[in-house]
């Protein structure tokens, strides 16, 4: 029998308000993949959660498509594979489910194609496919990361930021919000003065996080001009959640990625009460505390 590739891939939250398409943080929700060669004639999928059972099992499957794309880039052929999948990451909720699947697909191609990619190369590939590093970088490395993708040189640069000493709460609505629909809400252009203002806020927020000044960082996280003002109306619960969080003296309430999940930076002494208040008052969502993931994707080979 063939060896089994086991992957544990974290979720991620992008933007942190003012870091549009550049800042992301890994979270302890996971996509679990167990992959091995099979004697069948086409790739097989075994889904262990209800959400994943919605995914296609033909060549339109995202993991299949990306794995074959990577294999083609390095001129290797992949064997017929069986993929077992279980995910804690809700689909189309702004928690990086597609980035987790993308990173998983690259690892699958790397192992079964014997490509020998470095982690740096995995990052470059993932960002080139995704178009921005805000989800894929923390998914690969863990922690909180700022990054930039140069779409001319096709190079990605990242910088790691200290893990914030806050409690993280995610409020997850029951409905999906596709990234494409969320991006359509954004303006095509910003004035020079608007761009300068938002850039200055983002720069200062990063410095505040680096100095562990969460009061200032949280204040600035909520002053985005790139995307939040144009997306908040797509999330019916946003204002109510922000009000409740403010009543519990939270540092910041922002959209997670493209939404509809809402991300809260909470004071540790208030987080439990805040989560309970959210779950009792905002019944259309599920709120929970989630740890910041510091390890990134984990790979394990089971020899058979």
Curated annotation (Swiss-Prot):
This is Homoserine kinase. It catalyses: L-homoserine + ATP = O-phospho-L-homoserine + ADP + H(+). It holds the Pfam family GHMP_kinases_N. ATP binds at residues 90-100. Transmembrane segments: none annotated. The lineage of its organism: Bacteria, Bacillati, Bacillota, Bacilli, Bacillales. Pathway: Amino-acid biosynthesis; L-threonine biosynthesis; L-threonine from L-aspartate: step 4/5. GO terms for biological process: threonine biosynthetic process. The gene is thrB. It is found in: Cytoplasm. Catalyzes the ATP-dependent phosphorylation of L-homoserine to L-homoserine phosphate. InterPro entries: GHMP_kinase_C_dom, GHMP_kinase_C_sf, GHMP_kinase_N_dom, GHMP_knse_ATP-bd_CS, Homoserine_kinase, Ribosomal_Su5_D2-typ_SF, Ribsml_uS5_D2-typ_fold_subgr. PANTHER family: HOMOSERINE KINASE, HOMOSERINE/4-DIPHOSPHOCYTIDYL-2-C-METHYL-D-ERYTHRITOL KINASE. It comes from the Bacteria. Gene3D superfamilies: 3.30.230.10, GHMP kinase, C-terminal domain. Belongs to the GHMP kinase family. Homoserine kinase subfamily. Its main location: cytoplasm.
């Amino acid at each position: 029998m063939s060896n089994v590739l086991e992957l544990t891939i974290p979720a991620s939250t992008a933007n942190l308000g003012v870091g549009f398409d550049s800042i992301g943080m890994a979270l302890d929700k996971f996509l679990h993949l167990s992959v091995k060669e099979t004697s069948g004639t086409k790739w097989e999928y075994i889904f262990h959660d209800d959400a994943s059972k919605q995914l296609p099992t033909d060549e339109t499957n995202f993991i299949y498509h990306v794995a074959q794309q990577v294999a083609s880039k390095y001129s290797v052929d992949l064997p017929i594979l069986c993929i077992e999948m279980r995910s804690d990451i809700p689909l189309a909720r702004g928690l990086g489910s597609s980035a987790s699947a993308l990173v998983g697909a690259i690892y699958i191609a790397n192992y079964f194609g014997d490509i020998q990619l470095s982690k740096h190369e995995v990052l470059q590939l993932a960002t080139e496919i995704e178009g921005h590093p805000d989800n894929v970088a923390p998914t690969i490395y863990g922690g909180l990361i700022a990054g930039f993708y140069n779409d001319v040189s096709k190079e990605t640069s990242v910088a790691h930021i200290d893990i914030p000493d806050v409690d993280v709460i995610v409020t997850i609505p029951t409905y999906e919000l596709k990234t494409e629909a969320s991006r359509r809400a954004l303006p095509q252009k910003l004035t020079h003065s608007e761009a300068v203002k938002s850039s200055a806020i983002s720069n200062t927020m990063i410095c505040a996080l680096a100095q562990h000044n969460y009061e200032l960082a949280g204040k600035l996280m909520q002053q985005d001009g790139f995307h939040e003002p144009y997306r908040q109306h797509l999330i019916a619960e946003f204002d109510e959640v922000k009000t409740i969080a403010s009543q519990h003296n939270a540092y910041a309430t922002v959209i997670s990625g493209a939404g509809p999940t809402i991300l809260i930076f909470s004071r540790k002494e208030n987080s439990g009460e805040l989560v309970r208040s959210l779950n009792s008052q905002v019944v259309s969502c599920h709120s929970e505390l989630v740890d910041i993931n510091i390890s990134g994707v984990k790979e394990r080979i089971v020899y058979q």
